[in-house]
């Protein structure tokens, strides 16, 4: 809804309150935004920021690990370069948060993490692990065909993903049983 005359209260960098009229307390740091459009920051839910390396050359590219098509053990934080210039670009474009991680080379590629873009270090930026990357498209098929390795078809790609998910399910069952108290 549009608020013609109103205010937005920001506390600790987050929107704490939105209201009509004037706020109860006016501060020196208040900004008069009359006639302006006010929006919260954007969230980019699919990026490889921090893995491609803004100007870092081949050494700065950690987006794909091509040694095995199934790599669920890859952790995004281990390859992420938080000093990548794309984070500063994101901040200047009002992108406040991103989900970033490995590329689409592998059918099972590793985890994805959510980050705040305006932070001084990775520990401060890290919101948490939010998922795992799966790729069913042409990228794994063409890469592994070129290497004369599996998967070379979408069928084989899907089969590898199913196998990895089944292994994960069995692992969960085993660990849940191990946590059950003995009688």
Where are these regions (language model features)?
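Intrinsically disordered, low-complexity coil segments
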Residues: 24, 31, 59, 145-148
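Metal-associated gating/positioning segment near the N- to mid-region
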Residues: 33-102, 106-107, 113
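Polyanionic/metal-chelating signatures
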Residues: 86, 91-183
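Glycine-rich loops and low-complexity Gly/Arg-rich segments
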Residues: 15-17, 35, 55-57, 67-69, ...
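Solvent-exposed, acidic/flexible segments
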Residues: 2-3, 80-83, 154
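N-terminal-biased segments
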Residues: 18-19, 38-53, 161-164, 168-169, ...
